[in-house]
């Protein structure tokens, strides 16, 4: 390039086995894919304008786009994890970060939200390892993630078919709640214990945020 000259360059991180995706990407130029991406996000969020604080509207939309960018998907269009610290193929999982990344989908992207619900149904409860016993009370708020996402999804979209298609999902959520409710002693307040918040110890007898998740 000559001094002060510029040129757009497309960069694709792709699975070489998914040659159809690569061919589709190469069939159009950078401007086309940029416009397609912007149109997609406009269809979900519209154009948010806040006259008293224009930057706030822009930052909110940007945060929404970053949440989308946090997820890794397989060639079969299934969630692998989130690059905000979560990949199930490693022994280190920060489910709390991934849960926050999932929240925007409960309002705008039902298909992706359903994939998140199924992911947390499988990975939300800490498995037994060499250092920790795991289980529902390892991190109660993480264990409740599948229930909170399911509730938010149903509250906004009001769609029952997804849950009817996955009867084991309802049974698992019911079992989690039953385990939590039965953990309370008769002379205790209606509050519940947890060992960890996510990757930090929950100090005190009852952790406030965890119990807010429980009652959500």
What are these regions (language model features)?
Residues 29, 168, 172-175, 195-200:
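Secondary-structure junction/capping motif
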């Amino acid at each position: 390039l000559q001094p002060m000259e510029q040129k757009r360059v497309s960069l694709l991180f792709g699975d070489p086995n998914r040659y159809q995706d690569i061919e589709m990407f190469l069939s159009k130029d950078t401007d086309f894919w940029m416009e397609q991406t912007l149109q997609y996000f406009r269809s979900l969020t519209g154009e948010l304008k806040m006259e008293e604080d224009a930057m706030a509207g822009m930052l909110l939309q940007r945060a929404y786009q970053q949440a989308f960018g946090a997820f890794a998907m397989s060639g079969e269009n299934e969630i692998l994890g989130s690059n905000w610290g979560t990949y199930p193929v490693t022994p280190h999982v920060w489910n709390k970060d991934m849960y926050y990344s999932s929240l925007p989908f409960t309002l705008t992207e039902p298909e992706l939200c359903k994939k998140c619900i199924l992911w947390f149904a499988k990975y939300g409860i800490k498995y037994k390892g060499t250092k920790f016993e795991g289980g529902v009370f390892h991190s109660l708020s993480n264990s409740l993630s599948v229930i909170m996402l399911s509730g938010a999804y149903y509250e906004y979209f009001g769609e029952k078919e997804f849950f009817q298609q996955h009867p084991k999902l309802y049974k698992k959520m019911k079992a989690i709640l039953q385990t939590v409710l039965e953990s309370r002693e008769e002379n205790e307040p209606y509050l519940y214990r947890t060992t960890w918040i996510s990757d930090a110890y929950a100090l005190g007898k009852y952790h406030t945020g965890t119990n807010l998740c429980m009652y959500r």
